[in-house]
Structure formats: C-alpha cells, structure tokens
C-alpha cells in the first residue's frame, strides 16, 4: 500500500509538471529530500526517478519557462569553479574509482545549486520552494520526533523513515537541518501566503518546531546539539 501511495503521489506531481514545468523543480526537491524511491519496496526503487525528474526540470525550464528576468550571479560562477575543482581533484585522487563512488551525489547537487536560482523569478516560486522543502523535511522530522518522545532514541539507533545513512536520513545531518529550519518555520507561520496565517498553521508550525527540537536529543548527534545551543543563544 505504501508503494502505491508513493507512485500515485509522484505520478500526480510529475503529471502536473507537464502543465506547469516549475512543478518539476519542486518535485525534484521533494525526491531529493524524502527519497521515496528508497522508501519503496518494489514499484519505484528500480527506476532512476531522481534523474528522470532532474532532466524534466531542466528541459522544462529550457523549453517553456520565461527567461526575461533570469540573471546569473557571482555565486553561480563560484559554484561552477567549485564543480570543476571537484572534478579535477576526483580524477587525480589516490583512489579515483573509490573517490568517484563516494562523492557521486555531489555532481547532481552542484549542478542543481547552479540551476535552481535561474527558476526562482517570483516571490510565489520562492515561497513554493520553501514550503515544499519544509514539508519534505517535516516528513522526516515528525517521524523522528514521535519516536524520540515515545522511545528515546540514541546515536545511530534512531530510525527515521529510512534505516540507512542516506542524505537527510543520516542522524547528524538531519538533526542539524531540523534545528536550522526552525527560524524558517517560524517565518512561514507569520508571512506565508499559500497557507495564510491562522490557528491551524500556528499549531502545525509549533508542533513541527517541537519535533525538530527533539531530533538532536533522539539522535544524540553533536552537530544538532551545537546547532540547538547556538539557536538558543541567538
């Protein structure tokens, strides 16, 4: 049943993207954070869904999107230099095959970081991206928060939605991300327009903040605990 739910949601998301190509961008962000292909047992775990949506997002932007307000920034040029530097140091590493395998995810992440600002032309698009990223991270944070409140957790033993160290499912990374998005959650509670501020939005945002605050406790990861202390000071 879970596989059917993932497939139905992804196909609906991708289908809407053919009408509004910017939705491919949001769909890729969801896939990159939640990794539904790794949560699936058999229907989509053998399909390179991330690469497919990545390609659709770029092709959709090139073919359809309005580019009159597109601007390149110095940051994107620096990222291109970093991409070239990563490639050069990888092929010249002492163990190039192992290095290429270890950092295979970096290439797509850097290309996406260069490409993404080109698509964010309006405030609505920026807010849509923020909302999708928050809700995607919330899917992991809420699961971790509930398990921490119910059973405690422990370093390397708190299972989030996925029982392996992949992306945000690695305890140290997710605990740091959970604390880092708390200011963004509170900002959205006050200034969101897709879901305008009301008591339901406030309850969800406060509950999500509480779940995020529990993550460093449940994972017992130093990175998250340091982030929590710094956030409390600020």
Label each PLM-derived region with a short phrase.
Residues 98-105, 162-164:
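Non-cytosolic membrane-interface motifs at loop->transmembrane helix junctions
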Residues 32, 37-45, 153-160, 164-167:
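Flexible, active-site-adjacent loop/turn segments at secondary-structure boundaries
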Residues 34-36, 56-61, 108-114, 232-234:
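Alpha-helical transmembrane segments and their membrane-interface exit regions
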Residues 8-17, 83-91, 108-112, 127-160, ...:
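Alpha-helical transmembrane segments of multi-pass inner-membrane proteins
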Residues 1-88, 97, 101, 123-131, ...:
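Transmembrane signal-anchor hairpin modules in multi-pass inner-membrane enzymes, especially those
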Residues 14, 100-103, 116, 170:
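Hydrophobic alpha-helical transmembrane segments of multi-pass membrane proteins
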